[in-house]
């Protein structure tokens, strides 16, 4: 029976363009998993959206001379366009300024407050008398209290790496006006996370976590402390009965997964449909993030959910990536270590990029994108193994007049059957890799199947069989090779969907009925592809090159 699967990726911050690190970490893995689960025939909903509040947005909007809403509107569109260009198959891309978000965030707060999990406290914060407002860390710079570097940020020193509170800076000043700042008392609401340690530990024991982060998550939960969830800003979700305060972005943003699903349901004129995913325990909920977001998704948001009387679905699996670097350094547009995605796609095909990002995904440790590795993988793997297998078989078939290939049991020899059995086993291996969220291993399975096909075609040498007048054997070999290609397209589709579709188009297998499929959301195909192949017929069309050499 099909499963209902909810997939979410960390909401991208509407404060700048996306780069390869974002895509390889949280969005391509989620897209690949969504495509895989759709292939299995499951009821999949992939929700994402723009995170549109927070200090960094107000700071950069002011620097750009733009209104806050105008600024986030710009990046909401940019991000959506980027995901579309990259083939990230998000079912609905919402935003935290959606019409459902404000009330839902305030309801979360009110419920937590009523249960004694939120209390107000007085604290000292940096205040600009010239600007007449409190300034949070992103607005502040000064002298690092650890190394003495002048120009350190309000939350960490970019020179020595120390982290601290903005109030620890020596000679703090406003980034906007340059004015000196003073300490002034202010009141904030604090979420008492330390009161949720036991239920959080019990919950996290039931949740899939990559083994390399489980200890970190457990230790983090055991050491939870009260955390301020309000800010002195004008841009954000207003806090009920607390004048001039808005919610800290990391209190409101995760609730955007729920409000975004409400937004999706409303867009379909089925306003209650969100409940099928968020209020049904049978839903399988998988969350994809980068490692810098682990505390918020593994502890803070689950604590907020546990504090609600409405039984919102909590994640069943947290898939966290490590950092993805560019030539060994962090992506940084301001420091010139950056690749513009649009410019890159003007030169290289989308599936080349998707494949290399998947093959080098930072799953258990930091990894990097390098142009040399990109070139090597494209030329050696995509062209030399994958593309070569597809092209040589189909060109040989066309050149020698084989347009219709049908199964014939009496023509298959033992080596053919062994080849097909091994091909099907690799498909089952790929299914296991996708189920365990490993893009790297899935890429290895793809190349293993392509290599298997190449070896089989070489060993059978149909060009020799043709010279010997054994056309019946040639037909059997071509059928087996094309069946392998059909399976190769299947296991490739989650990662390189455009290429997989092109293979299916050239093979025109009777079993697929391509006209009835949605190219961008192929569904319910995986198990059917592994069924008995005895009724399959291929109607071959003119072969096209799938990949070209990268110079």
From Swiss-Prot:
Residues that, per the record, bind Zn(2+): 144, 147, 157, 160
GO terms for cellular component: cytosol
Subcellular location: Cytoplasm
Gene3D superfamilies from the UniProt entry: HUPs, Isoleucyl-tRNA Synthetase, Domain 1, Methionyl-tRNA synthetase, Zn-domain
One term of GO molecular function: methionine-tRNA ligase activity
CDD domains: Anticodon_Ia_Met, MetRS_core
Keywords assigned by UniProt, alphabetized: Aminoacyl-tRNA synthetase, ATP-binding, Cytoplasm, Ligase, Metal-binding, Nucleotide-binding, Protein biosynthesis, Zinc
Family: Belongs to the class-I aminoacyl-tRNA synthetase family. MetG type 1 subfamily.
HAMAP family per the UniProt record, alphabetical: Met_tRNA_synth_type1
Protein name (record): Methionine--tRNA ligase
Lineage: Bacteria, Pseudomonadati, Chlamydiota, Chlamydiia, Chlamydiales
UniProt gene name: metG
């Amino acid at each position: 029976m099909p499963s209902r699967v909810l997939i979410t990726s960390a909401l991208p911050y509407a404060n700048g363009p996306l780069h390869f690190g974002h895509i390889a970490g949280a969005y391509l893995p989620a897209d690949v998993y969504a495509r895989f689960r759709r292939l299995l025939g499951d009821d999949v909903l992939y929700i994402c959206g723009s995170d549109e509040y927070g200090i960094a947005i107000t700071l950069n909007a002011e620097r750009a001379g733009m209104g806050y809403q105008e600024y986030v509107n710009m990046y909401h569109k940019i991000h959506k366009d980027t995901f579309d260009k990259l083939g990230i198959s998000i079912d609905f891309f919402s935003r935290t300024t959606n019409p459902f978000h404000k009330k839902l965030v305030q309801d979360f707060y009110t419920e937590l407050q009523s249960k004694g999990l939120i209390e107000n406290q007085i604290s000292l914060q940096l205040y600009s008398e010239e600007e007449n407002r409190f300034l949070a860390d992103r607005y502040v710079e000064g002298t690092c209290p650890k190394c003495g570097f002048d120009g350190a940020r309000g939350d960490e020193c970019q020179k020595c790496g120390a982290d601290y509170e903005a109030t620890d800076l020596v000679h703090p000043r406003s980034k906007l006006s340059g004015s000196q700042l003073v300490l002034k008392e202010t009141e904030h609401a604090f979420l008492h996370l330390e009161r949720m340690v036991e239920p959080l530990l019990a919950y996290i024991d039931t949740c899939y976590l990559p083994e390399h982060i489980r200890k970190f998550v457990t230790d983090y939960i055991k050491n939870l402390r009260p955390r301020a969830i309000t800010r002195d800003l004008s841009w954000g979700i207003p806090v009920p009965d607390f004048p001039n305060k808005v919610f800290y972005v990391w209190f409101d943003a995760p609730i955007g997964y729920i409000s975004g699903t409400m937004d999706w349901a409303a867009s379909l004129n089925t306003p209650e449909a969100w409940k099928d995913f968020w209020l049904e325990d049978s839903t399988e909920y998988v969350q994809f993030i980068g490692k810098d977001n682990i505390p918020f998704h593994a502890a803070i948001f689950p604590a907020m959910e546990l504090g609600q009387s409405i039984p919102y679905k909590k994640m069943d699996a947290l898939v966290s990536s490590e950092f993805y670097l560019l030539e060994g350094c962090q992506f940084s547009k301001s420091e010139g270590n950056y690749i513009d995605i649009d410019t890159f796609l003007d030169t290289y095909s989308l599936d080349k990029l998707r494949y290399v990002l998947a093959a080098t995904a930072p799953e258990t440790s930091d990894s990097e994108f390098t142009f040399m590795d990109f070139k090597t993988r494209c030329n050696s793997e995509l062209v030399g193994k994958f593309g070569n297998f597809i092209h040589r078989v189909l060109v040989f078939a066309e050149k020698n007049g084989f347009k219709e290939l049908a199964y014939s049991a009496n023509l298959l020899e033992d080596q053919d059957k062994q080849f097909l059995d091994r091909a099907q086993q690799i498909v089952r291996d790929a299914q296991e890799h996708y189920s365990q969220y490993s893009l790297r291993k899935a890429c290895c399975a793809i190349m293993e199947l392509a290599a298997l096909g190449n070896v089989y075609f070489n060993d059978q040498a149909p060009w020799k069989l043709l010279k010997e007048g054994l056309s019946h054997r040639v037909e059997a070999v071509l059928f087996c090779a094309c069946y392998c290609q059909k399976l190769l397209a299947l296991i490739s589709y989650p990662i390189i969907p455009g290429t997989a579709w092109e293979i299916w188009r050239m093979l025109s297998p009777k079993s697929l009925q391509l006209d009835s499929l949605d190219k961008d959301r192929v569904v319910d195909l995986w198990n059917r592809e592994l069924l008995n192949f005895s009724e399959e017929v291929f109607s071959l069309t003119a072969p096209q090159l799938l990949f070209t050499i990268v110079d």
